[in-house]
Regions:
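Alpha/beta-hydrolase active-site loop
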Residues: 243-265
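Conserved small/polar residues in nucleotide/adenosyl-binding loops
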Residues: 372
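Gly/Ser-rich "nucleophile elbow"/oxyanion-hole loop immediately N-terminal to the catalytic nucleophile
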Residues: 260-275, 295
Length: 373
């Protein structure tokens, strides 16, 4: 909409933004006419996606709390909701240009004597705050992580994490050492403020089997502890390339076995434990469940897998759609794989758990998103 309650113009310099939008629309009409098209209609997919994007933008503002015509409060009985686009004129222009650059994404084009063209899809797939962060990272012109070397990438991640907000408080935080597959491993423990004993979650951090440690997912572990009322034990497993496959996988299993055997000492409830992990950590958590099944324990009652790496096949559509423009690129993922294991190992279920037997495993909750390879 060029102007009116559904456009960005009402929250900007209206005259200028309307003029810019009119110019854009005129250019599109001329280009489509030259191609023989006389009608342009948004697809249902695009409309639904745009409505979600507008709602996501509104949740990041105070407009949703305002008692004004912006929310429909000017007419008694009128449905309430944030009417203007609150994402800003800059992002709006960028989205318009992206629609054109991707072949009129989200629109059905028709005209006499020409074949119908429909490039269906969501115009905006990312949450607005995620889109903003990615834009800020792009403006920093940082070198690709895969060009930094393993230690350089670790140092970069450590510095990068210093700027993140602190995690929320929990009842108690502690550190210690546990027995891994080939020696001691560090862990960080998060205990709820409520009286125990509590169930235990064994957590494995992300980082492509190369980056991160038991401290790197601290805000998430704190939040998980608060939300679940469970003890979270974040494990510092061994990393590639110093320790290639199967070091991380075997450490994950050994750590889970040790934690289950020492539940009392950790203030936990004896019995089954849960496993959780993000990205490469989700890979280790899934592998741990298969190893526990095949090796006679420990008993695992559930698995929380967040964007887990489950297979080593690189011809999936996600590797095409999300090859660039995100923090985890196709090139970075290839780098992680090459450091972690040889091509000959990549069909091993301890590398690609999706290739293993899936019967007899604990129930899994898998959280994923559209923008990962």
């Amino acid at each position: 909409m060029i102007t009116g309650p559904g456009s960005p113009s009402v929250l900007s310099n209206m005259a200028v933004s309307i003029e810019q939008h009119v110019d854009w629309v005129v250019e599109r009409i001329a280009a489509l006419r030259d191609a023989g098209f006389t009608t342009m209609e948004a697809t249902d997919t695009a409309q639904a996606g745009w409505e979600r994007h507008m709602a996501d933008c509104a949740t990041l503002t105070l407009h949703r709390l305002a008692n004004t015509w912006y929310t429909g409060a000017n007419v008694p009985g009128k449905p309430q909701g944030v009417m203007p686009y609150t994402g800003g004129v800059g992002p709006y222009r960028s989205i318009c240009n992206e629609v054109v650059g991707r072949g009129m994404l989200g629109f059905r084009l028709t005209g006499p004597g020409v074949a119908e063209q429909c490039n269906d899809g969501e115009v905006v797939r990312l949450q607005p705050d995620v889109r903003l962060v990615l834009g800020m990272l792009a403006e920093m012109n940082l070198p690709p992580i895969e060009t930094m070397g393993a230690q350089g990438a670790r140092d970069f991640l450590t510095e990068f994490n210093k700027g993140r907000p602190a995690g929320r408080p929990v009842g108690e935080v502690g550190t210690g050492m546990l027995q891994g597959a080939d020696g001691p491993l560090p862990y960080k423990l998060y205990r709820p403020a409520t009286a125990g004993p509590h169930p235990i979650v064994v957590y494995f951090h992300g980082g492509g089997w190369v980056l991160g440690d038991e401290l790197s997912d601290d805000p998430f572990c704190r939040d998980l502890c608060r939300r679940t009322g469970m003890i979270i034990v974040s494990v510092g497993y061994r990393h590639a390339p110093e320790h290639r496959f199967p070091a991380a996988a075997e450490d994950g299993y050994a750590a889970t076995r040790w934690i289950a055997a020492h539940a009392d000492e950790l203030g936990g409830r004896p019995g089954p434990v849960l496993v959780a992990g993000w990205s490469a950590g989700g890979n280790i958590a899934a592998v741990t469940c298969q190893l526990a099944r095949d090796r006679g324990g420990p008993e695992i009652s559930g698995q929380l897998l967040i964007c887990p790496v489950t297979d080593s096949t690189f011809d999936r559509q996600s590797y095409v759609d999300n090859a660039a423009g995100y923090f985890l690129t196709r090139g970075l993922m290839f780098w992680f794989w090459d450091l972690y294991c040889s091509p000959a190992d990549r069909t091993d279920p301890r590398v690609a758990p999706l290739r293993g037997k899936l019967e007899g495993l604990p129930p899994a909750f898998i959280a994923d998103r559209k923008s990962v390879v």
